Regions:
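Short, hydrophobic/glycine-enriched beta-strand segments
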Residues: 21-27, 32
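Active-site flanking residues adjacent to catalytic metal/cofactor-binding acidic residues
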Residues: 26, 66, 195
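Short glycine-enriched, charge-decorated loop/helix-capping segments at active-site entrances
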Residues: 36-43, 138-144
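Active-site alpha/beta core segments
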Residues: 48-165
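Histidine-anchored nucleotide/phosphate-binding helix
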Residues: 53, 175-186
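Structural recognition of alpha->loop->beta junctions
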Residues: 117-120, 204-228
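Glycine-rich anion-binding loop/nest that anchors nucleotide
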Residues: 163-176, 195-198
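Short, flexible loop segments at boundaries between secondary-structure elements
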Residues: 193-206
Length: 228
């Protein structure tokens, strides 16, 4: 699929009160940058904009997620004999993409990106630390051996602080950003995606991602208006 040469430009948003809103920055880590173990298309292009948004301190709360896998994680192609990265298998009755080894705990590629001022972050959610289960969403793990998607605790943390609206950005737009936004909407949060502050694994993922966001009632927001 060819990416549209004229990508969606969300309308500029009127000034809004963000004191009851949370910014959720998904997996801004070196292994997802160009040259990294699981590079996202133009992943480094969003770093300055996310840094500016965090420095603006417009949001009542800021959460970052961090992919944090143990060696030998079930999502790694290297954990399955004869399998290659980006192949799909069935795991616990659900489709599972097999990934290159990435974001292994306590390795440089798993760190939060050094080009961002993280001082405004209130909480960091580490995902994928269970060796048996992948974890795309900030809110729930993927399906595990019991056939359920255990919560990460983020939804309760946000509700305890009066948050009813979330803005999601980061990597990858067609995987962890999408799953996080979908879960946020299903859990009752008014949900926005900062499209220009996300990038996909490959541009081929953009059209189905747009369709999924629209289907689930998730809005696109203008990042420039939020950092002004």
């Amino acid at each position: 699929m060819i990416e549209c040469p004229c990508p969606i430009r969300p309308p500029r948003m009127p000034a809004i009160d963000l004191s009851r809103a949370a910014l959720i920055v998904i997996d801004l880590q070196p292994d997802f940058m160009p040259g990294g173990a699981l590079a996202c298309h133009e992943g480094d292009a969003i770093v300055p904009g996310i840094d500016a948004l965090l420095r603006a301190r417009r949001f009542g709360h800021v959460v970052a997620t961090q992919d944090w896998h143990p060696a030998g994680h079930v999502s790694f192609a290297s954990s399955h004999a004869g399998r290659a990265p980006f192949e799909s298998i069935t795991l616990y009755g659900q489709p599972q993409t097999l990934w290159p080894e990435h974001c292994v705990q306590r390795t440089p590629g798993a760190a939060l990106h050094a080009g961002v001022d993280w001082s405004s972050v209130d909480a960091v959610i580490r995902k994928g630390s269970d060796p048996r289960v992948d974890s795309y969403s900030a809110f729930r793990e993927n399906h595990g051996p019991a056939g359920t998607r255990p919560p990460t605790g983020l939804a309760g943390w946000l509700r305890e602080r009066g948050v009813d609206e979330v803005f999601v950005c980061g990597l990858a737009r067609d995987v962890c950003v999408l799953w996080s936004a979908q879960d946020a909407a299903r859990l009752g949060f008014r949900t926005h995606v900062l499209w220009e502050l996300c990038r996909p694994v490959t541009p081929a993922g953009d059209a189905p991602t747009r369709a999924a966001l629209q289907r689930d009632g998730i809005m696109l927001a203008d990042a420039a208006a939020l950092s002004a």
